[in-house]
Amino acid sequence: MKYQSKALIDYKFLYVVVLSLSLIGLSLLSRVSQAQDLALTELNTLYQALLNDYVSPGEKNGLTANMVNYAEIRHDDRLNDLMTRLQNYPLENLDTKQKKTAFYLNAYNILSITKVADNWPLKRLKSLGSFFKPVWTHSAGKVCGEKMTLRILERDILQQLGEPRIHFALNCAS
């Protein structure tokens, strides 16, 4: 009888240990997830701050639109910080379709804005390319450690996500 109660106590102890380790593991996974979300939140917050500072309503060719102040944004170090964050962002953190869509849309627009800012003054982003080598096929920077063109981002990544409104969210630096 003593042996049965000791065995029962051992199983209860083992159960408590396994349960405790599981809870610790879940806690650690939660912290990893929070850190991943924090990196994405910081990137998005930085991007939003730039947009708030350099995008304002304006008029061009009789049309009212939100206009980027490229003459000023090109001098802001936060644009370089954004490019670094895009380059170093871990691909494995993009674990949902929603995160991928938002991240890659922002990446496309950040790369477009940077391309214009780096070549300012410029009338159209398209003018950086030629008939045989359009700007969309030029290297635009790195995203998640991979060299990226605007065409790869749009056609090979964003369109594959199956979101029909994607084209309306791409600004092409216009």
List the predicted regions and their residue ranges.
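Interaction/scaffold regions that mediate signaling and macromolecular assembly across diverse proteins
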Residues: Q36-L94, Q98-S174
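Bacterial N-terminal signal peptides
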Residues: Y15-S27
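N-terminal secretory signal peptides that target proteins for export/translocation
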Residues: M1-Y11
